[in-house]
From Swiss-Prot:
GO cellular component term of the entry, any: cytoplasm
InterPro entries to which the protein is assigned, alphabetical: Fum_hydII, Fumarase/histidase_N, Fumarase_C_C, Fumarate_lyase_CS, Fumarate_lyase_fam, Fumarate_lyase_N, L-Aspartase-like
Gene (UniProt): fumC
Further comment: There are 2 substrate-binding sites: the catalytic A site, and the non-catalytic B site that may play a role in the transfer of substrate or product between the active site and the solvent. Alternatively, the B site may bind allosteric effectors.
Organism field: Shigella flexneri
Record's subunit section: Homotetramer.
Catalysis: reaction(s): (S)-malate = fumarate + H2O
Designated name of the protein: Fumarate hydratase class II
């Protein structure tokens, strides 16, 4: 039995593994780009299959492709979407910057599989042609950016946004539950005036709510599809109705609000939609990193740290120190946030590059974009499940630190003035006195006045503020 078969493209014949559906151009890419281990993301491959499926349907409707071929292409695409042919897409991210080789990988696989479905064979005698049939009315220059947007929008809608909403809801519930717990505030890593634990967490909630708005604001641009622009945006070799119809078909089969891009030149020449959307993801990463850092600082200890909250103890934390437990969910979240920030730099560089009518950094851009979405979605799910839901206040420790804080003296500003209040705080700190003892020693107010004016629960504004 032959282990290879001969496939042919415009450069001539080349041997391809007999058991594989891919063809000549995929094989050339495999041989010419043996770079690292990063492969084209499966979600991008499936987005390419969705794009080819929609194109086959529209080409049939416009009488550009026979019903027999269109049906076979759609069936082959459905098999790809079902994961039956995942190992037929072996190409590296590091290939042509337009994604042409991955587009042809899909064209070849669908053409060979569709030919088999029609009773034919794979290879040069196939019944369905990768360029003339599967790629009809298309160019890699509009197919690949379309697949990028399809994969990105679906990932944001199905993976990231639900997890962001879940974490926001968890923290919102914690904010309400802890609304009456007065604690010391901290600015510049120094003691500050009081607030409630609920107010502190309400700030985290508001951050995530803003992040959601920023992400949702970016979605309409991501929903614009380049398909129909073909090589340089002019729509050469396409039917006048093709671009609109294929966007409508993709909207139907994905249940997502895809539309044809109003300007195909922008859609081909830039990655602006993904640059802007990833900027929102970077903002989310910054917020999550701040939240995770706050959580692990507030939970530091257990005896020699701040220790105002407790978080779940999920696993042993040290191979040498018995009983040690670490804030591992916070650490995982902060690490992946750093990766997302790094991805943003690469995406910005890629988006700013490319020349004239085509951006040629697309595989790198979509690889990093989809990685960021997955990291953030998985990270939020893990942090929520294994940390956030288990946050509990340590009321005794909170009260201890609150009562030891010199910054409660701020309540005296409006009664005795800033300078005298500062003198009280400095004397208390220097001599190891309580604020009350220092105030009475200086003779600036009576004990009754101090007890009436320095009341932490009255220094937090509305106890319900924020949430």
């Amino acid at each position: 039995m032959n282990t290879v078969r001969s496939e042919k493209d415009s450069m001539g014949a080349i041997d391809v593994p007999a058991d594989k559906l891919w063809g000549a151009q995929t094989q050339r890419s495999l041989e010419h780009f043996r770079i690292s281990t990063e492969k084209m993301p499966t979600s991008l491959i499936h987005a390419l299959a969705l794009t080819k499926r929609a194109a086959a349907k529209v080409n049939e409707d416009l009488d550009l492709l026979s019903e027999e071929k269109a049906s076979a292409i759609r069936q082959a695409a459905d098999e790809v979407l079902a994961g039956q042919h995942d190992d037929e897409f072996p190409l590296a991210i590091w290939q042509t910057g337009s994604g042409t080789q991955s587009n042809m990988n899909m064209n070849e696989v669908l053409a060979n599989r569709a030919s088999e479905l029609l009773g034919g064979v794979r290879g040069m005698e196939r019944k369905v042609h990768p360029n003339d049939d599967v790629n009809k009315s298309q160019s890699s220059n509009d197919v690949f950016p379309t697949a990028m947007h399809v994969a990105a929008l679906l990932a944001l809608r199905k993976q990231l946004i639900p997890q962001l909403k879940t974490l926001t809801q968890t923290l919102s519930e914690k904010s309400r539950a802890f609304a009456d717990i007065v604690k010391i505030g901290r600015t510049h890593l120094q003691d500050a005036t009081p607030l409630t634990l609920g107010q502190e967490i309400s700030g985290w909630v508001a951050m995530l709510e803003h992040n959601l708005k920023h992400i949702e604001y970016s979605l309409p641009h991501v929903a614009e599809l380049a398909l129909g622009g073909t090589a340089v945006g002019t729509g050469l070799n396409t039917h006048p109705e093709y671009a609109r119809r294929v966007a409508d078909e993709l909207a139907v089969i994905t249940c997502a609000p895809f539309v044809t891009a109003p300007n195909k030149f922008e859609a081909l020449a830039t990655c602006d939609a993904l640059v802007q959307a990833h900027g929102a993801l970077k903002g989310l990463a910054a917020s999550l990193m701040k939240i995770a850092n706050d959580v692990r600082w507030l939970a530091s200890g257990p005896r020699c740290g701040i220790g105002e909250i407790s978080i779940p103890e999920n696993e042993p934390g040290s191979s040498i120190m018995p009983g040690k437990v670490n804030p591992t969910q916070c650490e995982a979240l902060t690490m992946l946030c750093c990766q997302v920030m790094g991805n943003d730099v690469a995406i910005n560089m890629g988006g700013a590059s490319g020349n004239f009518e085509l951006n040629v950094f697309r595989p790198m851009v979509i690889h990093n974009f989809l990685q960021s979405v997955r990291l953030l979605a998985d990270g939020m799910e893990s942090f929520n499940k294994h940390c956030a839901v288990g946050i509990e206040p340590n009321r005794e420790r909170i009260n201890q630190l609150l009562n030891e804080s010199l910054m409660l003296v701020t309540a005296l500003n409006t009664h005795i003035g800033y300078d005298k209040a500062a003198e009280i705080a400095k004397k208390a700190h220097k001599e190891g006195l309580t604020l009350k003892a220092a105030a009475l020693a200086l003779g600036y107010l009576s004990e009754a006045e101090f007890d009436s004016w320095v009341r932490p629960e009255q220094m937090v504004g509305s106890m319900k503020a924020g949430r």
